[in-house]
A protein has these predicted regions:
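N-terminal entry/capping and adjacent linker segments that precede and initiate structured domains
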Residues: 1-357
Length: 357
């Protein structure tokens, strides 16, 4: 087997479930070495026509593969094939954050965190300073690009005028308070990209006048970057949701509370200090009178098919979410994910060989 070409080895690995990769890597020394190549792991997982997702069902985190082969076939119900690639069974999960193949999972009871790499099977538990984390705690995950991709976790806490930021160091197994003073507040879900984490933020005392903006936390420098512009003016009542495209681009969904249009923008350039945008999709919401009346929870973009899958509130239960697809020229569809009302999309997923220290 050690004499097989790299192309053939990649083809073999691409057909193996993510959580079974460890057994395949142990087949021979060359395969194990190859599996640690970051350029190689980018091509792992399902074929390019499929999308890997992290979803929660019954407080369990699942790694799923979805094939949107029914897109643009002029049917309202979009037929999909979905299969489970992995599952984190040890604990009930409230939230999942993704960074370069690593998942930061917040437990339902806020008693601890777990960082999990479905590709390598590694996991690492993180304990709070006191008995438990606070329900107002927010988290982010990233890594130091100058230190062998050293993984770090950011915790931040807002209460009235009090703000606290901490970094968890895996080597010392301890939390360190950051000397950071901010005059703005983060209140929406974050997204990690290329080791850094991006947040939607607003000024703490001039919300409506200033509007919202983008902030990046640089895990290498352990500090926030400058204020970055969004391609629109938004306030707290509007829907503004971040997503990522294969750890390469940032996407943002925007729907003004009193407007009939919904927009999705994608970055053409982004780092801790600069950002530029292009409009990916603009949807006339009058075509969907029964949908998207309340803020959606999450979304993902298929750039090649020029569609977006949006998890919107289910009008039957008003507690669960269902996935709907929108695209150019009024294209729409309901995505059949098998009991989709029981699932919650957290983020897209890209496998990686990044190690948890």
């Amino acid at each position: 087997m050690s004499n097989l070409s790299r192309d053939l080895v990649e083809e073999i690995h691409s057909r193996v479930p993510i959580t079974s990769q460890r057994a395949v890597r142990s087949t021979c020394k060359r395969w194990n070495v190859l599996s640690k190549d970051q350029n190689y792991t980018k091509h792992l997982g399902p074929a390019s026509k499929e999308i890997m997702l992290i979803m929660i069902r019954g407080c369990r985190a699942h790694l799923m593969s979805v094939n949107l082969h029914g897109v643009h076939n002029h049917k309202y119900l979009v037929d999909t094939s979905i299969k489970e690639l992995g599952k984190l069974n040890q604990v009930e999960i409230f939230e999942v954050l993704h960074c370069d193949g690593l998942l930061l999972c917040v437990t339902k009871d806020y008693s601890r965190l777990v960082v999990w790499n479905p590709y390598s099977g590694q996991n690492r538990w993180i304990q709070p300073k006191s008995n438990t984390f606070h329900t107002l705690d927010r988290f982010a995950i990233g890594y130091d690009i100058n230190n062998n991709q050293k993984v770090k976790v950011l915790r931040f806490y807002y209460w009235s005028d009090y703000v606290e930021y901490e970094i968890f160091d895996f080597k010392s197994n301890s939390w360190t308070v950051l000397d950071v003073t901010t005059h703005w507040k983060i209140h929406r879900r974050s997204v990690s990209l290329k080791g850094n984490t991006y947040f939607i933020a607003h000024e703490r005392f001039k919300v409506d006048q200033q509007g919202e903006f983008l902030r990046c936390f640089d895990f290498t420098k352990e500090r926030f970057g400058p204020r970055l512009p969004l391609p629109f003016h938004s306030c707290l009542d509007d829907s503004v949701i971040l997503s990522s495209l294969r750890e390469e681009k940032l996407a943002v969904l925007f729907k003004k509370c009193d407007a009939c249009d919904m927009e999705i923008w994608i970055t053409t350039k982004i780092d801790a200090n600069t950002v530029s945008w292009r409009n990916f999709l603009k949807v006339d919401m009058q075509l969907y009178p029964e949908r998207f009346r309340s803020p959606c929870r999450s979304f993902l973009v298929d750039e090649k098919k020029k569609v977006a899958v949006i998890f919107d509130i289910d009008r039957k239960t008003w507690t669960n979410y269902k996935p709907y697809m929108v695209g150019e020229d009024g294209y729409q569809g309901e995505v059949d994910l098998r009991d989709s009302e029981l699932w919650m999309l957290m983020c897209s997923y890209v496998p990686s060989s990044v190690k948890i220290q």
